[in-house]
UniProtKB/Swiss-Prot annotation:
Region listing for Disordered, in residue ranges: 230-374, 386-435
Keyword Repeat: yes
Endpoints of the signal sequence: 1-22
Modification type Pyrrolidone carboxylic acid: residues: 194
Chief place where the protein resides: secreted
Protein name: Antho-RFamide neuropeptides type 1
Propeptide residue intervals: 23-193, 199-201, 207-209, 215-217, 223-225, 231-233, 239-241, 247-249, 255-257, 263-265, 271-273, 279-281, 287-289, 295-297, 303-305, 311-313, 319-321, 327-329, 335-342, 348-355, 361-368, 374-435
UniProt keyword annotation of Signal present: yes
Biological function: Not known but it could act as a transmitter at neuromuscular synapses.
Amino acid sequence: MTTVSYVTILLTVLVQVLTSDAKATNNKRELSSGLKERSLSDDAPQFWKGRFSRSEEDPQFWKGRFSDPQFWKGRFSDPQFWKGRFSDPQFWKGRFSDPQFWKGRFSDPQFWKGRFSDPQFWKGRFSDGTKRENDPQYWKGRFSRSFEDQPDSEAQFWKGRFARTSSGEKREPQYWKGRFSRDSVPGRYGRELQGRFGRELQGRFGREAQGRFGRELQGRFGREFQGRFGREDQGRFGREDQGRFGREDQGRFGREDQGRFGREDQGRFGREDQGRFGRELQGRFGREFQGRFGREDQGRFGREDQGRFGRELQGRFGREDQGRFGREDQGRFGREDLAKEDQGRFGREDLAKEDQGRFGREDIAEADQGRFGRNAAAAAAAAAAAKKRTIDVIDIESDPKPQTRFRDGKDMQEKRKVEKKDKIEKSDDALAKTS
């Protein structure tokens, strides 16, 4: 809000106050003139007439009191009222990182000065042992009234104190003088005019006119008019008008209008419009819109859209799309792309060579799918072939230049396939001769 807006609001409030005062004055005049014509006794039926239900002479008394269309106009419908409340880019800037944020909050050397360390602060507050022990007149008249030297008798003392008389007589200004206070001063227990235990006019324990424990007119513990613990008019602990602990008008702990702990309108702990602890609109601890702890839109702890701890879209702990712990799409424990090991359960070998063996890596297509055995001669032949093939595979793996898919060229791969085929045929012939 600009300065012009504040000036306009102040002028409007001033006009309303002046108008209400004028109306109140007119009402008092009318009421006083009406009271002169009526009897004000309790038993008179005309006593309450016109008090709250204005007589038939003025049926318009309550008209427009709360139904005035201009009364609520502009209260919340002003297009400038909400402007900049949540869309200010500087909204969360400097919430807790500002070195000046907490400066002077509770470390002001003058803040606690004289609160409880003043040697005169507690003097005469709750103990007055010397006077109680030595002065026999200390408690005289404190809790009981002595009727000595009173013109009225004891039975007549309370007559007319709290009940109106039937004659409607007007009370004198001095009627209550000295009724419940000491003869010397109007104070009840204290040493000043209106203090109860303190030394000032209206203070209960403090030293000022309206303070309870503090030194100012309206402060309870503080030094300002309306502050409870702080030094400003309306602040409770802080230094501003409406802040509770902070320095701004409406902030509770912060410096801005509506923030509870921060400096902006609606943020609680963070620096953005709707974030709780983070810096973005919807993030709780992170910096993005929907992330809880991370920096991306939907991630909980990570930096990507759907990852919980990782950096990719769907990974839980890893960095790839579908991997759980690794970096590949569908691998369970490893990190390979599984294009090399299409569907292997425990190993990394190319199971296109073994064609779905359950426990081993052998070519069970030759063993005719026996569950526990390998039927007849086919089973023995398959076992021998598997044993020989295992040896051949070991020899191939011990080759100083093993087969690789990415280093060797196409010609080298063809050459190795031919050599491997020849070795297998020779081993089959030798096995047939022995059988």
